[in-house]
Amino acid sequence: MARRCEVTGRGTVSGNNVSHSHIKTRRTWKVNLIKKRIFLEDENRWVTIRLSTRALRTLRKKGIKAAIKDNGGSLGVLAPKKYAGITKQAPKKA
């Protein structure tokens, strides 16, 4: 699973550290992600999504569905996970 916000699509970006002598070295900036349980009132259920703290502010201001639509995302993020709670198991040997 990529380190990407499911609401805004923000992910890891890369760039340069620049020293005093202008020597450039590559580095990455990682997005501040959290797992958050959100209650969908119209569907009467909880969903767990990974979102950035910036998206959490937007979510509190606008609401979950409006925040996803405004960022060009899909409401499929809120769909129930087909295999939630099921772990992959190796086939049993006879």
UniProtKB/Swiss-Prot annotation:
GO terms for cellular component: ribonucleoprotein complex; ribosome. The keyword Thylakoid does not apply. It holds the Pfam family Ribosomal_L28. Gene3D superfamilies: Ribosomal protein L28/L24. GO terms for molecular function: structural constituent of ribosome. Coiled coil: none annotated. One of its GO terms (biological process) is translation. Residues 1-21 are annotated as: Disordered. Keywords: Ribonucleoprotein, Ribosomal protein. The keyword Ribosomal protein applies. Residues 11-20 have a biased composition (Polar residues). Belongs to the bacterial ribosomal protein bL28 family. PANTHER family: 39S RIBOSOMAL PROTEIN L28, MITOCHONDRIAL, LARGE RIBOSOMAL SUBUNIT PROTEIN BL28M. This is Large ribosomal subunit protein bL28. It comes from Leptospira interrogans serogroup Icterohaemorrhagiae serovar Lai (strain 56601).
